[in-house]
Amino acid sequence: MSRTIFCTFLQREAEGQDFQLYPGELGKRIYNEISKEAWAQWQHKQTMLINEKKLNMMNAEHRKLLEQEMVNFLFEGKEVHIEGYTPEDKK
């Protein structure tokens, strides 16, 4: 049975995560406040960001950058800037 949460990102009730996807306090916050739909949107942005900036997840600085972008996107409403990318709705 799925659980319903109020998603901070979507600003509406939505299906919550099945389990904590990220470690620590930030992971608890994501589990409690971010829906599956919002997390999928972040994963799409994350993949683009890793590829375009050629981030290496073995590098602690790159992981820190990605975590900050995640917080900005999910909790602060900031768009992820990916150089050279124009969203479909803005073309």
Curated annotation (Swiss-Prot):
The keyword Iron applies. Pfam families: Iron_traffic (PF04362). It comes from the Bacteria. One of its GO terms (cellular component) is cytosol. Gene3D superfamilies: Fe(II) trafficking protein YggX. Keywords: Iron, Stress response. InterPro entries: Fe_traffick_prot_YggX (IPR007457), Fe_traffick_prot_YggX_sf (IPR036766). Induction: By oxidative stress and SoxS. GO terms for molecular function: iron ion binding. Monomer. Could be a mediator in iron transactions between iron acquisition and iron-requiring processes, such as synthesis and/or repair of Fe-S clusters in biosynthetic enzymes. Necessary to maintain high levels of aconitase under oxidative stress. Belongs to the Fe(2+)-trafficking protein family. This is Probable Fe(2+)-trafficking protein.
